[in-house]
Structure formats: C-alpha cells, structure tokens
C-alpha cells in the first residue's frame, strides 16, 4: 500500500508541475492575445481567449493522462479488459466504472488517479473562470475608453 501511495504521489506531483507550467503559459499567451486583439469585436476577443485557454488545458489533461498510462506501462501494471490509457482516462476523469481494476496489487492506483484528476480538472475550471473575469474586466475598460 505504501508503495502505491508513494508512486501515485510522485506521478501526481509530476502532473501538478505539468499543470503549473501550462497555467503559466496560458497567463502569458492570454495577456499577449488580449493586448493584440484590442481592435476585435468584444465577442471575438472573448471567444479567442477562451478557445485558446480550453485547447491548452485539454492538451495538458491528455498529457497528464498519458503520464499515468506511461507510469502503468513502466511499472508493469495491467488493467483487465482495457488498455492502460483507457484505464487511466476513465479514472482520471473520476468516471471509474469499477468494472476494471488495476492488477498486480495496484488496486489503489485508480482512486489515486481519480483524486489527481479531480484536483487538476478543478484547477482548470478556476483558470477558465479567471480568463473570463479578465476578459470581462478588459471589456469594461474598453467600453469606458470608448465613451
């Protein structure tokens, strides 16, 4: 059990680092785009910011799921009836039907993945909300300037 917790904690930590890097990139990119899109209509500007944010976060989540699958492959952990990527995906999004469990004494790895996924998905929701707030604030400034 301790080895499962340590291994799961290590992969979770790496995933948190991936998400932190992606968060930093999103902040940099959205600030540059916000400045470069002053001439666009408000709707197009917000749409561009949100689209880029959601695409970047989706890429981060797929990479994080792939890291879980890679860990399972390296550790020789099998998931009955599915591949490791499908198993990792199901658990990361906390869907975890429960019909497939990790073999070889790694039964805790699924719940650890689910907790990791829930935290990172919640983090993504916070980023999306913050981008929307930032866009709304900038739109308010733009409207004040045009009056």
Residue ranges and their predicted role:
Residues 1, 40-47, 99-103:
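Helix-boundary and loop/linker segments of multi-pass membrane transporters
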Residues 19-27, 64-68, 121-125:
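Alpha-helical transmembrane segments of polytopic integral membrane proteins
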Residues 1-11:
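Feature marks short, highly hydrophobic, charge-poor N-terminal signal-anchor/signal peptide-like helices
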């Amino acid at each position: 059990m301790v080895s499962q917790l340590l291994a799961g904690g290590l992969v979770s930590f790496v995933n948190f680092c991936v998400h932190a890097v992606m968060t930093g990139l999103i902040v940099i990119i959205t600030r540059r785009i916000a400045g470069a899109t002053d001439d666009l209509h408000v709707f197009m500007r917000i749409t561009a910011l949100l689209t880029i944010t959601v695409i970047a976060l989706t890429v981060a989540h797929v990479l994080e799921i792939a890291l879980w699958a890679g860990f399972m492959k390296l550790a020789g952990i099998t998931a009955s009836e599915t591949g490791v990527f499908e198993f990792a995906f199901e658990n990361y999004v906390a869907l975890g039907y429960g019909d497939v469990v990790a073999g070889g004494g790694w039964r805790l790895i699924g719940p650890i993945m689910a907790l990791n996924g829930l935290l990172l998905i919640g983090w993504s929701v916070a980023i999306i909300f913050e981008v929307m707030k930032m866009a709304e604030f900038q739109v308010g400034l733009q409207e004040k300037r045009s009056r």
